[in-house]
Curated annotation (Swiss-Prot):
Belongs to the zinc-containing alcohol dehydrogenase family. Class-III subfamily. Keywords: Cytoplasm, Metal-binding, NAD, Oxidoreductase, Zinc. Signal peptide: none annotated. It comes from Escherichia coli (strain K12). It comes from the Bacteria. This is S-(hydroxymethyl)glutathione dehydrogenase. The gene is frmA.
Length: 369
């Protein structure tokens, strides 16, 4: 079938809006009509050429919502007409990782997904007879996309796709990191480095967890009003100080902050976040994705004296079994999604959405098909 899509033909180049061909779903696959998709920093990271798994030409996009059109052989968990969110972190329920109960990382389709292919090692997209790669198992920058059944969360059909599409990545990543990875407790102190969608979601998650002090940190003070709306008690611009941000935080509590979250992908900030964590028990959660090849470092003394470095992917959330509940929470108002959507655009305007993001003028732009 034909589908309008925003295709990245080469790294560092604007996306091109073209009509592509989408093949029917094969065994274990599902064809969906995407209704809305967010434009995320991860898409920009891959488009820049810095992503070691980046392959071109590719249909990007991984933060979407849509409706099932057709299912392939053997698919039982969804049917045509069901409303779904594609998942870049699958949940097969059968691999060693899923069975462990210790992680949300599933390896069922990871190897082929990292190569831009469907589980059988081929692609369902083509343009002028030439194959196009998939992206993170989702490719939501196409009006129609094919996704593995294990990479789809079935959601309430009454949910507002313009908002809940954000649960496909950024908001779930931030809120989940608070509850699942850090396990923030009432009264704990929290510092959030970087106030993009993920960082703001961490702030909201910290408020849900009844954290005592929630410190929001960013060099763009225009983000502070929204941070306060989500629950920040303090907002700090590091540029306002003539000393390292670590020292600013240690002035707040000389022993450090209970939980720090790095939501940028900057290895220097990762170190600062760790060294701002509370002596004896503080933990720092790395959420931001650094450029390939970069390494993190600190003095071993920082760890010997009780600080812990952790990482978090998709907030530790199991997509198929847990994400539908988060959609319900959003519908009840327990998760506030509307403020994240600062702009809505058509697919034809998608390059403008990337520009807004790079200029720091948007939190999330949602593309409506």
């Amino acid at each position: 079938m034909k589908s309008r899509a925003a295709v990245a033909f080469a790294p560092g180049k604007p996306l091109e809006i073209v009509e592509i061909d989408v093949a029917p779903p094969k065994k274990g696959e599902v064809l969906i009509k995407v209704t809305h998709t967010g434009v995320c920093h991860t898409d920009a990271f891959t488009l820049s050429g810095d992503d070691p798994e980046g392959v071109f030409p590719v249909v990007l996009g991984h933060e979407g919502a849509g409706v099932v059109v057709e299912v392939g052989e053997g698919v039982t968990s969804v049917k045509p007409g069901d409303h779904v969110i594609p998942l870049y972190t699958a949940e097969c329920g059968e691999c060693e990782f899923c069975r462990s109960g210790k992680t949300n990382l599933c390896v069922a389709v990871r190897e082929t997904q990292g190569k831009g292919l469907m589980p059988d090692g081929t692609t369902r997209f083509s343009y002028n007879g030439q194959p196009l790669y998939h992206y993170m198992g989702c490719s939501t920058f196409s009006e129609y996309t094919v996704v593995a059944e294990v990479s789809l969360a079935k959601i309430n059909p009454e949910a507002n796709h313009e908002h809940v599409c954000l649960l496909g990545c950024g908001v779930t990543t931030g809120i989940g990191a608070v509850h699942n990875t850090a396990k923030v407790q009432p009264g704990d102190s929290v510092a959030v480095f970087g106030l993009g969608a993920i960082g703001l979601a961490v702030v909201q998650g910290a408020r849900q967890a009844k954290a005592g002090r929630i410190i929001a940190i960013d060099t763009n003070p225009k983000k502070f009003d929204l941070a306060r709306r989500f629950g920040a008690t303090d907002c700090i611009n590091p540029n306002d100080y003539d000393k390292p941000i670590k020292d600013v935080l240690l002035d707040i509590n000389k022993w450090g902050i209970d939980h720090t979250f790095e939501c940028i992908g900057n290895v220097n900030v990762m170190r600062a976040a760790l060294e701002s964590a509370h002596r004896g028990w503080g933990q720092s959660v790395i959420i931001g994705v650094a450029v390939a090849g970069q390494e993190i470092s600190t003095r071993p003394f920082q760890l010997v004296t009780g600080r812990v470095w952790k990482g978090s992917a998709f907030g530790g959330v199991k997509g198929r079994s847990q994400l539908p509940g988060m959609v319900e929470d959003a519908m009840k108002g327990d998760i506030d999604l509307e403020p994240f959507v600062t702009h809505t655009m058509s697919l034809d305007e998608i390059n403008d959405a990337f520009d807004l993001m790079h200029e720091g003028k948007s939190i999330r732009t949602v593309i409506r098909y």
